[in-house]
Amino acid sequence: MLEMLMQWYRRRFSDPEAIALLVILVAGFSILFFFSGLLAPLLVAIVLAYLLEWPTARLQAIGCSRRWAASIVLILFVGILLLMAFVVMPIAWQQGIYLIRDMPGMLNKLSDFAATLPRRYPALMDAGIIDAMAENMRTRMLNMGDSVVKYSLASLVGLLTLAVYLVLVPLMVFFLVKDKEQMLNAVRRVLPRNRGLAGQVWNEMNQQITNYIRGKVLEMVVVGVATWLGFLLFGLNYSLLLAVLVGFSVLIPYIGAFVVTIPVVGVALFQFGLGTEFWSCFAVYLIIQALDGNLLVPVLFSEAVNLHPLVIILSVVIIGGLWGFWGVFFAIPLATLIKAVVHAWPDGQVTDTSS
């Protein structure tokens, strides 16, 4: 048994490049695990730098210098963000306030509907249980309102931090894009010399992460806009707010779509009842989700993601549990990284040293 373990160890860890790759991976994961909070602005800047690299490279290809290309792309990107911040988000925020205001009325309708269930299905429903559930929901709604107020007050403390980030992140993005090669060379100088295997994994992952981030942003925009137009077609209340939630839900594969369906169905049900409008609106929503999963995702991520759905779900749950939001966002790239490392890891044959 011991001899088998020794042979396995020599096969897997006798290559210096494999050891160098292992050291790099352990150091990288340790830094992210222990300092993810401090590195949040840098992580945001890296994600945005990946996103802006493609248009920067296109401008550079037609004759712009790297500095001017990075400046133009960053200015356009900040302009789009400001447009979103001053046009889209205030409307979505206002609709969120209206939704919270209307929740007690929705709860009363739900309670009235639930009260009729014992009469309709006496063998399945107990009036006492229904009343207890309704009272519990009312209590939770009141507590939720208090929590929203407390959270709003507590969030004021983070406004200064947010203001600092709004200045730091664009600056970091600019320098990450403008001085990309210099920074990569600086990183290479501190890495182990035997890093051929690590370089192989990096080259594969770099392109996949680029495709993934660019594809995710495009998927969010397409799904969000399509959902908003579909909801507008039926005059659904809080259409922009729900569309924004649906757009962001694509960040969490499978789980996000399931969770965001609950408020969509709830709002449509309370507005339309179980009539034709409800089923038509819900059908349009399901069609958008189906087109996203079966058409848009394969087109955008055919080169970036080649993982089984169960692996994706487990990656979101495990990595998201370790690193929160960033774990959820990077769950698929990290799972792809693990797969690439496993495939690239040397499986050297042990030679007979006795001869």
Model regions and ranges:
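Short, amphipathic, aromatic/basic-enriched membrane-interface segments that mark the entry/exit
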Residues: M6-E17, M137-R140, T210-G215, L232-F234, ...
